Amino acid sequence: MTSDQNDKPYDVVVRYAGLDDLDRLAPLFDAYRVFYEQPSDPAVARAFLAERLRLRESVLLLAEVDGAACGFIQLYPYFSSIAATRTWSLMDLYVAESARGAGVARLLMAKAAEHARATGASQLELSTAHGNSRAQALYESLGYELDTVYRYYSLAL
């Protein structure tokens, strides 16, 4: 695939993924976890995605080039009590190395925003590693703004 980063890559399709896509999604999800310094474990990747899809706890968007899976986004729904609206958390975004720089991430992000709007959400939130400057540049180029009002905490259980 050869395409300028700002051009729409040819033959890229972004669609909703289902349980029948697990064999294509699981290797991408495993590679995503490895990127974030988790050990490769295809069985864990497949089981995690299967449970999310089976229980309808997330929405997965799959990008394909000429029928081959090359990226995904996973969205989780939640609600903003303050705004009294639905919100979506863009928790996972991954594009295979062979498809990077061709606009696949932009297409996935656009489809995620389209999904959020279609479900009446007031916003689409995401987080990324402090050192992931490439992703940060993408998000900022799409109009995402760094939250300077709230500080987020977590508790390991």
Predicted regions and their residues:
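Conserved beta-strand in the GNAT
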Residues: 62, 68-77
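Conserved active-site alpha-helix within GNAT-family acetyltransferase domains
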Residues: 106, 130-149
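Conserved beta-strand-loop-alpha-helix junction that forms the acyl-donor binding cleft
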Residues: 100, 122-135, 154-157
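Active-site rim helix/loop that mediates acceptor-substrate recognition in acyltransferases
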Residues: 40-60
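Conserved GNAT acetyl-CoA-binding A-motif
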Residues: 109, 116-127
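A short beta-loop-alpha structural element at the N-terminal edge
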Residues: 13-27
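Helix-loop element at the rim of GNAT/NAT acetyltransferase active sites that forms part
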Residues: 27-40
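Conserved acetyl-CoA-binding loop-helix of GNAT-fold acetyltransferases
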Residues: 95, 101-114, 137, 141
